[in-house]
Each structure stands twice: as C-alpha cells, then as structure tokens.
From Swiss-Prot:
UniProt cross-references to InterPro entries, sorted A to Z: Glyco_transf_61_cat, Glycosyltransferase_61
Record field: transmembrane: 20-40
Keywords: Cell wall biogenesis/degradation, Glycoprotein, Glycosyltransferase, Golgi apparatus, Membrane, Signal-anchor, Transferase, Transmembrane, Transmembrane helix
Native source species: Oryza sativa subsp. japonica (Rice)
GO biological process, one term: plant-type cell wall organization
Protein name, as recorded: Alpha-1,3-arabinosyltransferase XAT3
Cytoplasmic side of membrane: 1-19
Pfam short name (any one): Glyco_transf_61
GO cellular component: Golgi membrane
Glycosylation sites: N172, N375, N443
Composition-biased stretches (Basic and acidic residues): 73-98, 126-138, 147-163
Amino acid sequence: MKAGERPKLVRGVRQESRRFRLLVIVVGFFLVSLTFVFVSKPDAILFSLNGKLPVEQAPTSILIQQKVNEPSGESRKTSTDALRGDPKVVDDEADAKPKGTGGGSEEEEGRVLSEPDPTSGMMEPTHNKDGNGHKSHQETLGGGGDGESKGNDEEGEHAEQKHKVTLPTVSNYTIHDAAEDTENAKQEGMNNVQQGSKPLCDFSNFRANVCEMRGDVRIHPTATSVLFMEPEGSQRDEVWKIKPYPRKGDEFCLSHITEVTVKSSKVAPECTKYHDVPAVIFSLTGYTGNLFHDFTDVLVPLFTTASEFNGEVQFLITDMALWWTIKYQTVLQKLSKYPVIDFSKDDQVHCFKHAIVGLHAYMEFTIDSTKAPHNYSMADFNRFMRGAYSLGRDSVTVLGEYPKIKPRLLIIKRHRTRMFLNLDEIISMAEELGFEVVIDEANVSSDISRFARLVNSVDVMMGVHGAGLTNCVFLPQHATLIQIVPWGGLDWISRTDFGNPAELMGLRYKQYSIGVDESSLTDQYPRDHEIFKNPISFHQRGFDFIRQTFMDKQNVKLDCKRFRPILLEALDNLNP
C-alpha cells in the first residue's frame, strides 16, 4: 500500500462509522417512539392498520341496538331475574273440569310463576279443542283464590294432569329474547323498511311484540294475515311474523299460539266488510283459564291497548276460547261496543283504517305508565274494573264516619294447601279488634259479579299467597291488602306478584312472612333441618321442589300475637 493511501482509508472508515452510529441512533429513536405509541395508544395503530372502526363507532345490528338502548331499569331487572333462575311461584292446585255455561272449562290457578304438576311434571298451556273445549285453571277471576270447588277434586284430577304447565318468570322473557326474535316473531325484509318511515312492528319490548298500522289495512283471518296496502312507487317491503300473546320468549307457551303474518303489499284481496273503527287482534290461548294470567296476560294488556278508543274498537281473537269471552264479557263489552270476531271461523276480508296486532304489556300484573298509551296506570285499571262491574265504593269508609258500621275484613279461605289451621282464632282476634269478618272462597264456581261486589264492600282483604289475591282489583281506593307469605324464601316473589301491583293501584299493602313456628313444615322436618336454616338454598333444586315443598305441602298457623300489629295498622289506615 502506498504511503498516501493509509490516511485516506482511515478517514473513510471513520466516516462510515459515524454514518453507522447515526443510523443506529435514528433506528433506535424510531423503535423507542413506536414502543411508546404501542404502549400508550395501541388502538391508534391497530385500527388504522386493519381498517376497522373503534368499538364505540362500529355499527351494530338492530337486535344489538335494541339491547343496548334498552332502558336501564329493564336491564337491571333482566340480570337480577336471570340470576335468580327460579320460576315464579304460582298458585295452585288444579282441578280441571268443563263448565257448561262457558262451553268450555276452567283450570286451577297455578300461581303467577308456575305450578307444574308432580305427577305429570309439566302442565300445558290451555288450548282449544274443537273451538271451545278449553282446559283451564280452577282459580279464575270470578273466584280466583284456591282453584278448588267443592266436590270437584276427584273429578278434576285426571284432567289436571293433562293441562299442567310450568309458567314462566319475568326472567324467562329476557333470557329467551333472541330465540323469540329469530323463531317465534321473526321479521323478514326488515332491511327493506322504507327510509324515513316507521316500521309496521315494534319488537323492542322484552315482553310483547306489537304491530300498528294506519291507512288501508286488510285483515284476512282465513290466511291469518294482515296486509298494509302501499301506494305505487313505495319502496316499503316488510314481512313480520307475530304471535299476539304477551309471553315473548316463552317458546312452550307460544307454540300453542297462532302465528299472524303482517306485511306491506301492493296487491291484496278485495274488501268484503268495511269497518269505521280500529281493530285489535290478540290470542286467548296461552295460560288463560288461570286467574292471575287472565289478568296479567290478557285483561290488563287489553285495557292498556284498547281503553283509549272508548268502546269504538273491534276485537279479533285468534285461538278463540268461547267460555273465556262469556266469563269476562262484562269487561269485553266495557272495552268494545262490537261483538268479537273469531279469527278461526271468519272468511271475510275485513278492511280497517287503523289496526293493532298484539297487546301492550310490560311487567307482571303491572302497567308501566311511562310507556303505556296515554300514560295509563294500574290506578286507572282499578278504576276501570270498579266501573265495569258497577261497584259502589270508590274509596274505603273512614272510621267514625258511620259509627254503627264496623270496618270489614275479608279472609280468603283455602282448602288442601296453604290453609289457615287456626282460622277460628284469627276470626276471634279480628272481631276483638273491631272488624266485621267475612270468610269466602274464591273458587272457580264463584260468580264474578257477586265476588267483585263482596271484595268492593270490604276495607281490608287478607289471604295466603295465591291467585285469589288477584281479586284485589275490585278493592276500593286506600283499602288494605295483606298477603301472608309461606315459609321458604318467597318474599320477593310475593311482592312482585301482588305487592307492587297493589300499591300501584292506590291500595295499601302489608306483607307478613310467617316464621318457622307458624309453618306446618315443622311436622315434616326436624327443627335443625336445613330447610329452616337456609330455605333459599333449596331454590337451586328447581321449581318442582319449591312448589311441592313450600306451596303444596305447607299450611299456616298464624301467631295471632305476632300478627295482631298488622291488623292494628290496617285499622289505623282507616283513620282520617
């Protein structure tokens, strides 16, 4: 190597070394910056790389939007009820027997939640046989309480086993929402809803789907279809499937309900009968024939849906139960001035300007006044029932207003299950406090009008948890309902079924939960048994066990000394 070339080589190496160090510094700085971005805001890189929107901006399906936008109150109820997991404890023992006057039959009550039969395991919802051969629960409105009529026990035993069903809880509705939307109330062509127009149907309610149309509506019962006529040029193309009975998500119940197709159309059969009033379409199968469900599934929702029309509305009934319409004809005639149309036997094409398919329903035996048309409430329903049966008392009698008249106490008497074992002692205590005591059984053979008048004549009504308490709808304002809760951790069920509705109707409500010593279960289990230490733990065994143990096999012996303050408080409520 020449002497002059070495210094040049050394300078070249140094320059390359500086470039390399500079490159290392730049790359290092880039890596440090990238690491910082990944750690602090990883989504800024990930979403920009894969082209996806952040979660809060990503579009959601209609079903997801319905769930997300659901009111927080309903969401909370859904989660809590679902965690409970137990069917509501409904009433009662069933003695199904056909009733001649109704052309059908009425089943025993069954309690608000469910009451499967121990022999058959499940009890089916009532459904038509040859039009009106309906099996129903013994506890119906006209006598709601026990589901028992004297002399009918053995005769009804066989029929009872055929028509028992596990009645669903509120949580069932929400748990099965997805199944309902895809199976029992699926809509086709939802994407074809015309932009800017309201869909024909609203499937967002967790308990009931409802369709409502204004315009040229053609109802063709033979085809079980409701057609909404569209003008030429309209882009609307909707098809909905709906079962007009408010037990959304209860697939077993809805399997007995006729499905009605609601669709928009430019072609339809010619009208054969024109109506100047709106139409309301609903079903009478499901759990009708059960006192509590007659109200919570039909009468309360029907009032909520149809009351605004002041009688100028036409009812069309799918799955007709003739005996039911006869039993409740006073209520039906108060809501509609027109004879009901039997969907299954009508071959006309009825044309309306306004039609509603399905009934507005919310929680059990309750109207949500924030969502109901015209903000109807349970107080309005209570007033409506008193008016329908022409009941004389709108409010209780103030103590002292009529010195010779004693406050009246109605005790709902039961047989076979949840009986008062010391009824005479209870009567004596109540009379000692100044009550005039009336004892009655709210059974299937009771005349509704008579029983309504009896309930309306009293100031206080009491009874052990059961469908007979549904008759509180006839009580005057500010009357007191006292519910005796059997042993077994049934407090929340009892309040949900009757306590909350009673208070919403403007009644005073007292709930008395019996102690261990007041339960006949002490005759069946030792006092140190877990059933007394932790009854809630037995709910995990399912409703069959709950019903058989805490409902069917338990009677009540009230501790009159402990119960006395409840009656005294009811008396105080009658003071001005």
